[in-house]
Curated annotation (Swiss-Prot):
The active site is at residue 274. Its cofactor is FMN. Oxidase; part of the gene cluster that mediates the biosynthesis of fusaric acid, a mycotoxin with low to moderate toxicity to animals and humans, but with high phytotoxic properties. L-aspartate is suggested as fusaric acid amino acid precursor that is activated and further processed to O-acetyl-L-homoserine by cluster enzymes aspartate kinase FUB3 and homoserine O-acetyltransferase FUB5, as well as enzymes of the primary metabolism. The keyword Nucleotide-binding does not apply. Gene3D superfamilies: Aldolase class I. It comes from Fusarium oxysporum f. sp. lycopersici (strain 4287 / CBS 123668 / FGSC 9935 / NRRL 34936) (Fusarium vascular wilt of tomato). It is an enzyme of class 1 (oxidoreductase). PROSITE patterns: FMN_HYDROXY_ACID_DH_1, FMN_HYDROXY_ACID_DH_2. This is Oxidase FUB9. InterPro entries: Aldolase_TIM, Alpha-hydoxy_acid_DH_FMN, FMN-dep_DH, FMN_HAD, FMN_hydac_DH_AS. Residues 18-379 form the FMN hydroxy acid dehydrogenase domain. Transmembrane segments: none annotated. Fusaric acid is phytotoxic to plants such as cotton and banana. It has been shown to induce programmed cell death in plants. In addition to a mild toxicity to animals, fusaric acid exhibits acanthamoebicidal, antioomycete, and antimycobacterial activities. FMN binds at residues 126, 150, 178, 250, 305-309, 328-329.
Length: 387
């Protein structure tokens, strides 16, 4: 049975405290977090576009990739570290940009960042954050945790230039341009719920002229018009003229676009279908990675998000050629469950599962993880190599 077909079971209650669920997996955390959120905000975070086909596919696709462990390997000392944006990271795992963390918990993006910094886990901050980018990166007291700022193709380019300037001054290492959202996807749950944000919500990283309007999401969202005429050639060249931060693009799902990204000289791509929130019935990102990695590996850095729920999912992505994995909803679930401490719990679950998977698969360092550690089950029930 696919993991997406498994019913969400209520988290177990301890004997000592019947109100405190025991969290042993991301699935447990999702349930506990969802129980704490209102329907409007729970559906906003958990839902996708239209019929949620891509949302479900992102998660279910991992079950097709089967682990092939190597045995009698020295795994007495497992090193999960890697590099991102020229900086050392604890493992190939980071937090994706997602808007308005204070909808989940008052700790907001600062709380998410605090948990990331304590574990040297990179974070991409959304332009639509509720905390200043300076306060967010300031949670890494020694500056060792890598941060990037996310931007969209705003029609008002002054928004982007302001963000780039502030991010550079605050020690950010990269800018991540979201390229799969020239307009907002149709999210039926948000429409049914009449999605809006609480009065008084602020977006301190945006210029004053954006602080009113609907922005296409719902009441109270800044009025951010997107440049629907943006093209690869013009947009990337302009970004390069504005900053010396690394430039990554997020939202690549076509091998053709991966090739163009390489030709335009971006520093990295993030294979992403926006968590199934933009165009429904696009392929699962882990399947797209299998297409794109042979084209892009060694020519640009490759990251991926979408559907990751286990440390073994991270392992599978690295085996298929990803340099890095990002998660979005998982951090939100942690935040909703217990603020910054909940984000830490979420990250620790994935970190511990990933380390265990490396050890059981016979890998003592990231470079040991190869396509030989995976097989895929074809329609005839026969195991095949992934490449």
């Amino acid at each position: 049975m696919s993991r997406t077909n498994l019913p969400i079971q209520p988290a177990k209650m301890s004997d000592a405290t019947s109100s405190k669920p025991q969290i042993f997996s991301i699935q447990d955390l999702k349930q506990a977090a969802s129980d704490k959120m209102s329907q409007m905000y729970r559906d906003y975070y958990n839902g996708g576009a239209m019929d949620n086909i891509t949302l479900a596919s992102n998660e279910a696709a991992f079950d097709r990739y089967l682990l092939r462990p190597r045995v009698l390997r020295n795994v007495s000392n497992i090193d999960m570290t890697t590099t991102l944006w020229g900086t050392k990271a604890a493992l190939p795992l980071g937090v994706s940009p997602s808007a308005m963390h204070r909808l989940a918990h008052a700790d907001g993006e600062v709380g998410t960042s605090k948990a990331c910094a304590a574990r040297n886990v990179p974070m991409i901050l959304s332009a639509l954050s509720n905390d200043t980018l300076e306060d967010v990166s300031g949670q890494s007291s020694d500056g060792s945790t890598p941060y990037a700022i996310q931007v969209s193709p705003f029609k008002n380019r002054q928004i982007t230039t302001n963000l780039l300037s502030r991010a550079k001054a605050a020690g950010y290492k990269a800018v991540v341009l979201t390229v799969d959202a020239p307009m907002f996807g149709r999210r039926l749950d948000d429409l049914r719920n009449g999605f809006s944000i609480p009065p008084g919500f602020s977006f301190p990283n945006l210029s004053a002229q954006t602080q009113s309007g609907s922005g296409g999401l719902g009441g109270g969202i800044p009025d951010l018009s997107f440049d629907t005429a943006a093209t690869w050639e013009e947009k990337i060249a302009w970004m390069k003229s504005q900053t010396d931060l690394e430039i990554w693009v997020k939202g690549v799902t076509s091998p053709l676009d991966a090739q163009i990204a390489i030709e335009q000289g971006v520093d990295g791509i993030i294979i992403s279908n926006h968590g199934g929130r933009q165009l429904d019935t696009t392929p699962a990102t882990i399947d797209i990675l299998r297409e794109i990695a042979p084209i892009a590996k060694g020519k640009t850095r490759i990251a991926i998000d979408g559907g990751f729920r286990r440390g073994s999912d991270i392992f599978k992505a690295v085996a298929l050629g990803a340099d890095f994995v990002f998660v979005g909803r998982i951090a939100i679930w942690g935040l909703a469950y217990d603020g910054s401490n909940g984000v830490g719990l979420a990250l620790d679950l994935l970190i511990n599962e990933f380390k265990l998977c490396m050890g059981l698969a016979g890998c003592s360092k990231i470079s040991d993880i190869t396509p030989a550690h995976l097989s895929i089950l074809n329609a005839k029930g026969v195991l095949e190599s992934v490449y």
